[in-house]
Amino acid sequence: GDAAHAMVPFHGQGMNCAFEDCVALARQLDAHADLATAFAAFEAERKPDAAAIQRMALDNYLEMRDRVDDADYLLQRELELALQARHPGRFVPHYAMVTFMRIPYSLAMARTDIQRGILERATAGHATLDTLDWPAIDAEVHALLTPLEDVPG
C-alpha cells in the first residue's frame, strides 16, 4: 500500500489508501464510458487525498522523531484530549480522524492544521492546562470547527 503510493510508512494508511483508490476508480469507471475521462476524474478525485496522506505520514514521522518528549508538545496533546472531551464531534484528534473515520484525507489534514493552530495559540506561554483561558479556547473551537461526521463511502 505505502509503496504503491510513494509515501513513508509512518501513518499506516497505505493499504487503506489503496482500498479507497479502488472504490473511487470503480465509481469513475461506472460513471464514464470513456476510459480517458474516467481516469481523469479518478485523478482529480484522489490526487488531493494522496498528497494529504503523504504529507501527514511524513509529518507523523517528524513528530515521533522530534517532539514526543517536548514539554510544549506534551501540553498540546493534553489539551487535545481535553478539547475532544469538551467538544465531541467538533474537536476530533488527528489520529482519530485518519484512522477511525471515513473522511477524506484532505479534510483530515485541513482540520488538523486548524486544530494545531488552536492548540499552539492556547498553550503558548503556559506550562499547565490550569492557567489556560478556557472560555476563549471554547469560543475559538466553535468559531473554527464545525461538527464532523463520518462521510459515507
Describe the function of each predicted region:
Residues E20-V23, R77:
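A structural signal for well-ordered alpha-helical segments within the folded catalytic domains
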Residues P9-D21:
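A conserved FAD-binding loop/helix module that cradles the flavin
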Residues G1-P9:
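Short FAD-binding loop at a beta-strand-to-alpha-helix junction that anchors the flavin cofactor
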